[in-house]
Curated annotation (Swiss-Prot):
Cofactor: Mg(2+)
Post-translational modification: O-glycosylated. Hyperphosphorylated on serine residues, when in dimeric form. Phosphorylation by host CK1 is required for the hyperphosphorylation of NSP5 dimer.
Main function: Plays an essential role in the viral genome replication. Participates, together with NSP2, in the formation of viral factories (viroplasms), which are large inclusions in the host cytoplasm where replication intermediates are assembled and viral RNA replication takes place. Orchestrates the recruitment of viroplasmic proteins such as capsid proteins to these factories. Participates in the selective exclusion of host proteins from stress granules (SG) and P bodies (PB). Also participates in the sequestration of these remodeled organelles in viral factories.
Modification sites for Phosphoserine: 67, 153, 155, 163, 165
Protein's GO biological process: viral genome replication
Compositionally biased region (Low complexity): 17-30
Subcellular location: Host cytoplasm
GO CC term, one of those recorded: host cell cytoplasm
Similarity remark: Belongs to the rotavirus NSP5 family.
Protein name (database record): Non-structural protein 5
Single Gene Ontology MF annotation: ATP hydrolysis activity
């Protein structure tokens, strides 16, 4: 797991770091040592406005910014420095001290005596419990169990039409009574199903 923190979104932390003047550092450019006093601008918006208004237009350089965007202005202000005009180095004169190999000719050394230590602990706990309850479906509840029809065969005459049989064999069938009772019961079941629907 990696944790990345954008310092530009934490003005309260950075304000205590860049409020004071940092120690002077020594930069090396093309073999020349340059002493420079760097002063970080306060991230407070009001202080920055006073700083910009106190400077004359010709003294405002690329390192100064008048951006009103909080994130952009703070990001620029945290890196903005005031330098002396005499501390500049001409690139034309720097070519004279370049080594013949042209390897490692431009070197910049920068040291910052202040830093940020961030310690973050992330604890997470996820518990999932599921209960599976078996419930009878509506079909099972609505299903009705009808009694079983039992009938004995007999030889009694029952009134049956010839249309009930293809060849008129029902008149001589010994299961006429059973067939008739079954047919009446099937009609009752059909009517009951229609009412339920």
């Amino acid at each position: 797991m990696s944790l990345s923190i954008d310092v530009t979104s934490l003005p309260s932390i950075s304000s205590s770091i860049f409020k004071n003047e940092s120690s002077s550092t020594t930069s090396t450019l093309s073999g020349k040592s340059i002493g420079r006093s760097e002063q970080y601008i306060s991230p407070d918006a009001e202080a920055f406005n006073k700083y910009m208004l106190s400077k004359s237009p010709e003294d405002i350089g690329p390192s100064d910014s008048a951006s009103n965007d909080p994130l952009t202005s703070f990001s620029i202000r945290s890196n903005a420095v005031k330098t002396n005009a005499d501390a500049g180095v001409s690139m034309d004169s720097s070519t004279q001290s370049r080594p013949s190999s042209n390897v490692g000719c431009d070197q910049v050394d920068f040291s910052l005596t202040k830093g940020i230590n961030v310690s973050a602990n992330l604890d997470s706990c996820v518990s999932i419990s599921t209960d599976n309850k078996k419930e009878k479906s509506k079909k099972d509840k609505s299903r009705k169990h009808y009694p079983r029809i039992e009938a004995d065969s007999d030889s009694e005459d029952y009134v049956l039409d010839d249309s009930d049989s293809d060849d008129g064999k029902c008149k001589n069938c010994k299961y006429k009574k059973r067939c008739f009772a079954l047919r009446v019961r099937m009609k009752q079941v059909a009517m009951q199903l229609i009412e339920d629907l």
